Amino acid sequence: MTEEKLVERVTALFADSDAAQRKMIRLYAETNDAIEASAIIDSGAAVLHMLQGGLRPEVLVLDSVLSDTTIFPLLRSIRQQQIEYEPHIIVTLMPSAAPQIEKILTLVAECTIFKPYSLP
């Protein structure tokens, strides 16, 4: 009798302005059965456009500094959108941004992850 491994896939939208980070995320998502990257993008405008266009990832993983915005205006815009579901939001940031964590968490983010980080 063979043992089947059941893996629940999580759909996630990733936004990071660093091309190397996006490449690493793409590779990780391609090799990990638990992650389905619905989008890997570099700007807040692209995040908003995709959400307004009907993309419904379960999780948003957002860098605190994107190519066109910082996390605060982006979180406010996401919060103001009339979307019928609430994705889980994770924000990645540099340790120097630690004083901003409380503000980030009050603007709908559920978790923060400090960079640099490593993927298993």
Model-identified regions with their sequence ranges:
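Short amphipathic alpha-helix used as the core "switch/output" element in two-component signaling
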Residues: 72-85
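Acidic, metal-coordinating helix/loop segments flanking the phosphotransfer/catalytic sites
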Residues: 40-59
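A Lys-centered signature of the CheY-like receiver
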Residues: 115
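Conserved acidic segment of CheY-like receiver
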Residues: 8-21, 25-29, 60-61
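A short, hydrophobic beta-strand element within the central beta-sheet of small alpha/beta folds
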Residues: 60, 85-98, 109
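Acidic catalytic/metal-coordinating carboxylates
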Residues: 43, 70-73
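Receiver (REC) domain switch/active-site region of two-component response regulators
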Residues: 118
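Alpha4 helix (beta4-alpha4-beta5 surface) of REC/receiver domains from two-component response regulators
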Residues: 72-73, 95-112
